[in-house]
């Protein structure tokens, strides 16, 4: 359960804060100043995402230390794989938060939309109940749920001591979903409104 809780912490750190980022600038009126600069929107979105990725890696370090100090649990597998998985999940959630922020008009709307999707992603990820016990129609959704890939891979690395080959499928899925969402975040940002 401890490795799977990393997913919830990653959602909170890298999902909610970016969801509030651009929409707070819209409310304050500072987005107009950014829009008139000659900065490419890829650079702008990347500049918005990098601080959340760095913060996420710091939080993963704190979580690993707390798991060791409080519960006496240390990862059996490679710690670098844990950081790789966490980085890929933070790519997804920070991009998803920026997508929501791009489409939202105010902070309340952004938070409610993010909350709606986070609850669904957690419930359908296999964190609390095994994915195999879900009805087949619902089980299909785990193939597009990055949290389920993250939890499976974290359990494999953290508890079973799996190597990169044992989680290559999950890493590839997280990378593809994260890149898709990152591209969507850039494309959904409109400099001219």
Task: Cite the ranges covered by each PLM segment.
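Junction motif at the cytosolic side of a transmembrane helix
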Residues: 23, 99, 103, 158, ...
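Short helix-loop-helix connector
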Residues: 35, 39, 104-105, 129, ...
